[in-house]
Regions:
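C-terminal structural segment of proteins
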Residues: 1-275
């Protein structure tokens, strides 16, 4: 059975991370002694670190501790009109959802890294802490930093974002590439006023380091009634935008982006599309 550590505070947890680095696996909300854990890993049960397990609501600001697992995120996330709940449910099936912590999903090597796509749409910020201090980064700056490598012992301890307006409609979808070589995901938000799309925002994660807004696709549906033609056209424009930025023209990737964006938009608009 792997060694299990039970820190009770963020400083204690940070010290363990600085000492053991990539040998660690953080878990929360499960019994690490009774569940199957990877061999060769030092298991850190962060259940006792209260700061990492809080979902805090202060006026219009939501803060979610990164120690919660994706199962809890799928059940209890708030202020995002169901966006993070959708994403957590889609990217992690029920068999593993309670084993994967939010902080593990924020690792670029994680198969659950698509949780960052809705975070970009929410314009979230990430709080980090290390043995040398604290800092807060925008989600885009965090994604660039974490891909290059965070400071030794540094840990994302919380994600915060502004509450969405109650009339904002949201959607998320993800598809996996054949052969297990990564994923494509999209997140979108908009208002629907008498079936007309108002102030749409669409974020796509595919071939680029940081999920990107596809403004041409947004323009295609803005101010127009929800319909299948606009959805299909927006998917095509989004694919073209992403492929141009990635400086490639891959027919398979183009199809995946088109499908992902269309499914995301359709999930928002389906009740408003004429039959």
């Amino acid at each position: 059975m792997p060694a299990i550590q039970n820190p009770k505070s963020v400083p204690d947890l940070i010290k363990l991370i600085a000492r053991h680095g990539k040998k660690l696996l953080l878990v929360s909300g499960v019994d690490p002694s009774g569940d199957r854990m990877p061999v060769g890993k030092i298991i850190i049960d962060v259940t006792g670190v209260l700061l990492l397990n809080e979902i805090d609501i202060k006026k219009d600001r939501i803060t979610i501790g990164t120690g919660i697992n994706l199962g809890r995120l799928a059940r209890e996330a708030t202020g995002e009109n169901g966006l993070l709940q959708q994403a957590a449910s889609i990217i992690a099936n029920p068999l593993v959802r309670n084993r994967i912590t939010f902080v593990e999903a924020l690792n670029p090597d994680s198969p659950y890294f698509d949780i960052t796509t809705p975070l970009v749409l929410l314009d979230a910020k990430v709080r980090l802490q290390s043995t040398s201090g604290k800092r807060t980064l925008s989600i885009r700056d965090f994604l660039e930093a974490v891909t290059k490598g965070l400071k030794k012992g540094e840990l994302p301890i919380a994600v915060e974002f502004s509450r969405l307006p109650s009339d904002a409609r949201v959607g998320f979808f993800r598809v996996a590439r054949m052969g297990g070589k990564g994923t494509v995901s999209a997140a979108a938000r908009m208002k629907l006023v008498r079936t007309v799309c108002v102030n749409p925002e669409i974020v796509v994660s595919s071939l680029t380091l940081v999920p990107l807004r596809v403004k041409g696709a947004e323009k295609e549906i803005a101010g127009k009634p929800a319909n299948e033609f606009s959805i299909k056209k927006a998917g095509e424009i989004a694919a073209e935008e992403i492929l141009q930025l990635a400086e490639t023209d891959n027919a398979y990737e183009r199809t995946l982006i088109e499908i992902t964006v269309a499914r995301t938009l359709r999930s928002i608009m389906e009740g408003s599309i004429p039959m």
